[in-house]
Amino acid sequence: MDEQQWTGQLDLTVFFDGNRSVSRDIFFEKALKVIRPVYLNQSTIPTFYIVNVGGGYLDGDRYRMNVNVEDNAKVTLTSQGATKIYKTPSNHVEQYQTFNLKDNAYLEYVADPIIAYENAKFYQHNTFNLNNSSSLFYTDILTPGYSKTGEAFKYQYMHLINEIYIEDELVTYDNLLLNPNKQSINEIGYMEHYSHYGSAYFIHEDVNQKLIDSVYETISSYSNTFDCRVAISQLPTHGFAVRIFAYRTQIIEKILGTIQSYIAENIYDRKLDFLRKY
């Protein structure tokens, strides 16, 4: 796509300088920007806050983001607030995100919810390029926004594609389409009467069935405490995926945060940094 047609774009490279991970080659323009990194609690891992300066995604908006994590570097990415998709009467919103992870690199991307309002149309395509030794933790939360009638699922559609490659081989292709006009979203086989959806991927060379079982034991009790459903499955590589149905964003955030904390403590031997957004 011609650069003139992007509503916002962002390029970021993170490398390891021998002591900590640092950024270079930062470029952003128009409606996307990234705040100068912070090292929370004296961590050696930078945290970047990605901001949409326009306050929301509008009819026909196009966004592009490219993140490179070099050898031995680690980075945490998050958003400063929810991604709000407003009504798109003429043309849908598109977002393309590419993440390139080199040897022993680790990317942790925990964004705020994507909120689709009445008559919104949203398409997101993520591509993750990993090496055998690189690692990834990525989450998404989908939330129905306000409608005049008070009904959920008044958006036109939400279409999210995630492609994960390891050593240039496609190992996961996740194609999620929620289209209330053509699907009975509330029914069994879709959202099963729940209104909010959360997902996570974790890829690391130490992932095996024993670790997956341990993660599930850590989060399974939430189904007894809250009205939600949680499932975990092994990917066709050294990784797993988590799916969550709930009625509230906060429940999904709590479950995803528990998984993220488990990974930080059991895989990386560190405490999870509080992102301090508010």
Curated annotation (Swiss-Prot):
Name a GO CC annotation attached to this entry.
cytoplasm
What keywords sit in the KW lines?
Answer: Chaperone, Cytoplasm, Nickel insertion
The listed locations are: Cytoplasm
One Pfam family for this entry, by name? UreD
Record flagged with keyword Chaperone: yes
**Function text:** Required for maturation of urease via the functional incorporation of the urease nickel metallocenter.
State the oligomer form and interacting partners. UreD, UreF and UreG form a complex that acts as a GTP-hydrolysis-dependent molecular chaperone, activating the urease apoprotein by helping to assemble the nickel containing metallocenter of UreC. The UreE protein probably delivers the nickel.
Recorded hits in HAMAP family, A to Z, give: UreD (MF_01384)
Q: What is this protein called?
A: Urease accessory protein UreD
Q: Which organism is it from?
A: Staphylococcus aureus (strain NCTC 8325 / PS 47)
Gene transcribed to yield this protein:
ureD
